């Protein structure tokens, strides 16, 4: 099996059973295409989400190093920060979150509700900054300060998107391949592409397990020119760790994130409402709404390789719906 080196990495069991892979009959009828969904939004900790797959590897490494504090960074409404804080609480670890306000809003709902509300419930230590201009350096500076206070910190990068964290999505590709075997012949997979770890991990895994499947990353914060080098760098780092080659091209669509990261747009909000009304599935305004808008428009514009079944990776994020009201 090409991914056997995955077992070399310590892993903390946080998710348990594989997440569901479901057919969406009403959305499929609406779009005239078979649409499936990978439900990483229903992972079992703190309202779910995809970052738990990365945290299984990252937090295992933190515990191996003897850390008592997890430090990470993100937007005020970061799903990654929320899931990291929840795991820290579950394990009795301290959590420090370096947060920015990427949309510059003063709306109380955004500043206090949704994921931000949950951080307080998890007793997270909040550190605000004007902007995450160099998050790796900013996290290291924060870690040095926390260490001077007597803690043993472990830094988790933005989005959990290191080569180690992205192993969680190599593992997810294996899960998808097993769930689809003799059930559905996927043509394409669509995923939101942000901090790039989820996209890169899937790229490595699917290249070796389902090489005929087209993987599309819908960007949520950057142009193709900005995002592609980030995905490729992680793709190659992951492959190197697994003693694999990674030659698959990285496909990105950047038509759906404007006006910018964390700012809702009409197409994304229409996708949120469509999935809720047709399937009872909750997307979010920042990631999955925009990625689903790409899937819908991609079908309309015939951007996919063929007319076969499409799998949408639901990475979670529903808590942000409450913070973005009244946009919703």
From Swiss-Prot:
Fetch the Gene3D superfamilies from UniProt: 3.40.50.1100
GO BP terms in the entry: D-amino acid metabolic process
| EC number(s) recorded for this UniProt protein | 4.4.1.15
The answer on whether this UniProt entry bears the keyword Oxidoreductase reads no
* InterPro entries reported for this sequence: ACCD_DCysDesulf, D-Cys_desShydrase, D_Cys_desulphydr_bac, TrpB-like_PALP, TrpB-like_PALP_sf
- N6-(pyridoxal phosphate)lysine PTM positions read 51
Q: From the UniProt record, list the coiled-coil ranges.
A: none
Q: Which UniProt keywords are given for this protein, alphabetically ordered?
A: Lyase, Pyridoxal phosphate
- Detail the disulphide connectivity of this chain as listed in its UniProt entry: none
Its cofactor is:
pyridoxal 5'-phosphate
Q: How does it assemble?
A: Homodimer.
UniProt family annotation: Belongs to the ACC deaminase/D-cysteine desulfhydrase family.
The record describes the protein's role as: Catalyzes the alpha,beta-elimination reaction of D-cysteine and of several D-cysteine derivatives. It could be a defense mechanism against D-cysteine.
What is the protein named? D-cysteine desulfhydrase
| Species for this entry | Salmonella newport (strain SL254)
Q: Which gene encodes it?
A: dcyD
């Amino acid at each position: 099996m090409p991914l056997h080196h995955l077992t070399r990495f310590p892993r903390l069991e946080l998710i348990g059973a594989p997440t569901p892979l479901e057919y969406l009959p009403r959305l499929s009828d609406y779009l005239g295409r078979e649409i499936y969904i990978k439900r990483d939004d229903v992972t079992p900790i703190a309202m779910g989400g995809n970052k738990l797959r990365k945290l299984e590897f990252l937090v295992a490494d933190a515990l191996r190093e003897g850390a008592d504090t997890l430090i990470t960074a993100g937007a005020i409404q970061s799903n990654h920060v929320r899931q990291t804080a929840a795991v820290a609480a579950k394990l009795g670890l301290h959590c420090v979150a370096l947060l920015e306000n990427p949309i510059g809003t003063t709306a109380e709902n955004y500043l206090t509700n949704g994921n931000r509300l949950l951080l307080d419930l998890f007793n997270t230590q909040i550190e605000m900054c004007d902007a995450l201009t160099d998050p790796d350096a900013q996290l290291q500076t924060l870690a040095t300060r926390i260490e001077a206070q007597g803690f043993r910190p472990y830094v988790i990068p933005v989005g959990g998107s290191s080569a180690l964290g992205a192993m969680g999505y190599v593992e997810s590709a294996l899960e998808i391949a097993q769930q689809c075997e003799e059930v559905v012949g996927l043509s394409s997979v669509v995923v939101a592409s942000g901090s790039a770890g989820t996209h890169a991990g899937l790229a490595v895994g699917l290249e070796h397990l389902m090489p005929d499947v087209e993987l599309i990353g819908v960007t949520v914060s950057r142009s193709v020119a900005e995002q592609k080098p980030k995905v490729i760098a992680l793709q190659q780092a992951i492959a190197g760790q697994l003693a694999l080659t990674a030659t698959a091209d990285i496909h990105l669509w950047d038509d759906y994130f404007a006006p910018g990261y964390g700012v809702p747009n009409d197409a994304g909000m229409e996708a949120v409402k469509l999935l809720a009304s047709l399937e009872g599935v909750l997307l979010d305004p920042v990631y999955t709404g925009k990625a689903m808008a790409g899937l819908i428009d991609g079908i309309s514009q015939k951007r996919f390789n063929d007319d076969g079944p499409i799998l949408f990776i639901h990475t979670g994020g529903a808590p942000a719906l409450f913070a973005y009201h009244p946009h919703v």
